[in-house]
Amino acid sequence: MITIASTVNRGRSQGLLSRLRSRRFAAYWMILPLFVLIVGLVVYPFVWSVYLTMENKQETKFVGLKNFKDLIGYGTFWLVVGNSFRFTLTAVFFKATLGLMLALILNNLPFRGQRIWRGVSMIPWVMPLALSSMGWWWVFEPTHSAINWVLVQFGGTAKPWLSDPFWARVSTIVTNIWFGTPFFMIMYLAGLKSIPESLYEAAQIDGARALQRFRYVTFPMLSRLIAITVMFSTIVTF
């Protein structure tokens, strides 16, 4: 009797083990196509591109890090790096600041008006990049620039928006801010909606003013979201 019971228990345990193994291998088989796709489209091209950077121009000889040493020695390389850092830091700062300001304004609007203005504010972000680029090119175009026309009408002077290095940097930063601010706005607005109203009520009962409520309630609750959006935008902008 004992032998029969032990045999049955052993059979059940082996059946359970085989089912677990089959489920585990089934999971591996399910993720295998995605794994192959990632390796083929991401890992292999990345490794191959790194290898190509370590060959000579004719791609006939492996030169190691010589190309990187030559690149670091060029003055143009550091000029490009400096411009990229200035462009990224300036654009991300203004996008994050303006996005937070717009989110705070929209969050205090009535629900119906909030929906309308939220949709209007998202137009720059959802507009096709080619179309928005053509629009901004018309704004900064040297011959018929809309901004230069306004400046001249108010007694100012026309600016070389696309030919002068300084003004070209300003125009590209302004365009990037216009395009990227709605992303920050919608992310911060979603974060504001998740903050419990009880926190603001408690702060108001304690006598906290609007700026104090923002400093001690709103900003701490949005700090993680701000860090994530700034990091993501920095990677994309750079």
Residue positions per predicted region:
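A structural signal for multi-pass alpha-helical bundles of membrane permease subunits
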Residues: R23-F238
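Short, Lys/Arg-rich, polar N-terminal cytosolic tail immediately upstream
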Residues: M1-S22
